[in-house]
Amino acid sequence: MPGRLNAYRDVAPPGRVDLLQQLSKQVRGQRMLHVNASRAVGGVAEILQHLIPLLSELGIQARWEVMEGTESFYEATELFHLGLQGLDVMVSEALVDGYLECCRTNARSLDLSADVVMTHDVPPLALVDEAATDARWLWQCHLDLSHPQRKIWSLLRPYVTKYDAAVFSLPQFAQPLALPQFLIYPSLDPLSDKNRELAPEELDQILEKLQIPRDKPILLEVSGFNKFTDPLGVLAAYRRVKTHNDCRLVLAGSMPTDGPASQRVLEEVRDAAAKDEDIHLVLL
């Protein structure tokens, strides 16, 4: 069976690709729809960019729909994400109403016809209210839901319970729910550019383009700009290291697109790094 799947034979456990091909015969021809809030930014988008072609190669009719959001929608979902991961946030009734209205609007504009619909994280969560009775709806939560803020979880839990099943990244990230729960452990595509070896000349070209000198050791942090990746904590760790070993810090991450809270974190990082020429902020 030619195709991209065969490229994984060198990195997957022996027999795993053959097993996937055998198992796929049971669901071949099934229509599977994934729904999230971005086609280009974030971990979910990265997963789906690689997953959709593999599902299609296995004979599953895989599609990917992306929600269209308003400013209030993205502000609400950002606060929901922060609250679900334990931060104390306040979400106004107007933001909640804006989120739900945006979900209703997307339910009318998106093609939700499928045998299985998998929504990712909070943005498409409330789409389940428009679920077709002949489809199975799964909610995949990529967040740590172990200690959610009670008010936020109480608000969103009724939508989660309408799903046929939920998917979490680790057992300790899940919540007690009266529906089947499954685990899909976090992973990176071993064949993606993130795992590709860079030749020394490529490294030199990249550092030269970014105007980062190679006169001292480099510490590298690649992550988003939010409270949970804690870039200010990374700066503090770098400064502790620097008292013993002179070095540079490269703090690389994508431009925040999920709401004002992440924008504020980025501004705090800029302010904290402004007077240190050995800190290099790279926005991808």
Predicted regions and their residues:
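A conserved catalytic-core segment of Leloir-type glycosyltransferases
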Residues: M1-R31, Q49-S113, Q175, I184-P190
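Nucleotide-activated donor-binding/catalytic signature segment of Leloir-type glycosyltransferases, i.e.
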Residues: L251-L284
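Active-site proximal beta-strand in glycosyltransferases
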Residues: V116-M118, D129-H147, D164-V167, Q181-P186
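Donor nucleotide-sugar binding/catalytic pocket of nucleotide-sugar-dependent glycosyltransferases
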Residues: S146, R157-D215
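Short hydrophobic signal-anchor/transmembrane segments that target glycosyltransferases
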Residues: D230-D246, A272
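Conserved donor-binding/catalytic core segment of Leloir-type glycosyltransferases
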Residues: L33, L207-T229, L235, L249-V250
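Short donor-sugar binding/catalytic loops of nucleotide-sugar-dependent glycosyltransferases
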Residues: S38, P213, V222-N226, V241, ...
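Short N-terminal targeting/anchoring amphipathic segment
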Residues: L33-R39, N106-P123, L138
